[in-house]
Amino acid sequence: MFRQEMARYPKKSIKKRRVGRRKYGSKAATSHDYSSSGSILVPENTVKVFRIEPTDKTLPRYFIWKMFMLLVCKVKPGRILHWAMIKSSWEINQPTTCLEAPGLFIKPEHSHLVKLVCSGELEAGVATGTSDVECLLRKTTVLRKNVTEVDYLYLAFYCSSGVSINYQNRITYHV
């Protein structure tokens, strides 16, 4: 009797369900225009902030790093990129920003509920390959511990003379 009940649930249907759960981007973000606009250029000496809306209940370190590498497309040779990823539940309107070397720290005006996930700075060399940039980022990255809570992630960039950032449907909006 037990074997007959098990036969009612074939393995194929279970596999189909798992494929649908692999999408990490939110459904609301896929309908935004930002997902199809490709890359943008961050102006000189300005802070650009992106909000990442995770749908997974746990956000492990490797997923944070993979998400970050998808965002950074190209850094111009000779330019210094300061960046930071912060986690908080506040809405960014006009954040108070201050630079700390290495990396970038953002503090909101009306809240102190900010947790710095990772930060660093990158000085791009002559080689503009993605693998070279990824290697430089790994060397200069300071990754904080215990980043598993469900929350919004904010990714901030500050570049000495512009940086090209490629963002996909994982970004809900940018400020």
Curated annotation (Swiss-Prot):
Residues 9-25 have a biased composition (Basic residues). The keyword Nucleus does not apply. InterPro entries: Nanovirus_coat. The keyword Disulfide bond does not apply. It holds the Pfam family Nanovirus_coat. Its main location: virion. Keywords: Capsid protein, T=1 icosahedral capsid protein, Virion. It is found in: Virion. Residues 1-35 are annotated as: Disordered. GO terms for cellular component: T=1 icosahedral viral capsid. Belongs to the nanoviridae capsid protein family. This is Capsid protein. It comes from Banana bunchy top virus (isolate Autralia). The lineage of its organism: Viruses, Monodnaviria, Shotokuvirae, Cressdnaviricota, Arfiviricetes. The gene is DNA-S.
